[in-house]
Curated annotation (Swiss-Prot):
It comes from Bacillus subtilis (strain 168). One of its GO terms (molecular function) is hydrolase activity. It comes from the Bacteria. The keyword Hydrolase applies. The gene is ybaC. This is Probable aminopeptidase YbaC.
């Protein structure tokens, strides 16, 4: 007799690092390998919309999303700002991983890190490679200061062809990074979106994500205050540490196979810097993929290609 598949679709609250934190777990068969997804930001979790983009991924993996400490459904006014450090997030990630492995009776899992989450992933992989089969680095952050400078130059080049445009005016107004004022950062991110190199390459896709967050069961309007408060809280206490990160010096080697995925149009984390890190990284195996129709969120913008890419390079169980 062929055993029946046992699907799963749950929200699970855990006590992680002495704070309540929320997981969302989905898959068609709990016997499939686990995939833990570390969201970007800091402070921009995906639980509110991501289920719309991972149906194919759930055929191959039991997919776990986690609203990290101080963000989204894991936000609380009681969380100490002293705990909002990369080191605490690394410990949280390891604790979440160990709970998942014990709960599902697995020895290892697959780890995906997107943007800010890719910083956490590199540190976790460096400390506990024994817990993971393969790492999927999506829009891999390497050196935020260099990435910002590179993106700014790309935007200036685009704006030069449109000298009378609002883009040209704004890039000249803020000048080159580093920027000291919040308004300069806000204008810069607006310029990134104008050039279609931001969250998604197609603005319609970003609007769809917002609609899904507002109308979905996971967040909805009732929980948007937690999302927004968590976003402000996370950025306030983690941004300085984020900008000090340099993967070239901090994580020159990883002891697990690595697959890097970058969007061709990404101007938040330009592909050339991620690819330079990929080329210099010491790892037992590594692959590089560029998604031609994506900006910063290839797993959302091209979900079928993303699912196929991950499943093809999951060497264990699939």
């Amino acid at each position: 007799m062929i055993p029946e598949k046992k699907s799963i679709a749950i929200m699970k609250e855990l006590s992680i690092g002495n704070t309540k934190q929320m997981l969302m777990i989905n898959g068609v068969d709990v016997k499939n390998p686990l995939l833990l997804f570390l969201h970007g930001g800091p402070g921009t979790p995906q639980i509110g919309y991501v289920r719309h983009y991972q149906k194919e991924l759930e055929q191959y993996f039991t997919v776990v999303h986690w609203d990290q400490r101080g963000s989204g459904l894991s936000y609380s006014k009681r969380i100490s700002h002293h705990s909002m450090t990369i080191n605490h997030f690394i410990k949280d990630t390891i604790q979440v991983t160990q709970w998942l492995l014990a709960h599902f009776s697995k020895s290892k899992l697959y780890l995906a890190g997107h943007s800010w989450g890719s910083i956490l992933a590199l540190h976790v992989l460096q400390q506990r490679p024994d817990l993971f089969y393969t790492y999927y680095g999506i829009s891999q952050v390497v050196n935020p200061q260099d990435e910002e400078s590179t993106a700014y130059q790309h935007i200036r080049e685009i704006s030069e062809s449109k000298k009378a445009s609002i883009l040209s005016f704004l890039t000249r107004f803020i000048g080159a990074p580093p920027w000291k004022q919040d308004i300069q950062h806000l204008i810069y991110r607006f310029c990134v979106e104008l050039t279609r190199g931001g969250f998604t390459h197609r603005h319609r896709q970003s609007l769809a994500v917002l609609f899904q967050m507002l109308t979905g069961n996971e967040y909805g309007v009732r929980n948007m205050h937690s999302f927004l408060n968590g976003l402000r809280f996370s950025k306030k206490h983690l941004t300085d540490e984020l900008y000090r990160f340099n993967a070239f010096t901090s994580v020159p080697s990883i002891k697990v196979p690595c697959v890097f995925i970058s969007g061709k149009h990404d101007l938040i984390v330009p592909a050339e810097i991620s690819k330079q890190y990929y080329q210099e990284l010491e790892a037992p195996e590594k692959r590089w993929f560029q998604f031609e129709n994506s900006a910063h969120t290839p797993h959302i913008e091209e979900p079928s290609l993303f699912a196929n890419t991950l499943s093809r390079h999951a060497r264990h169980h699939l």
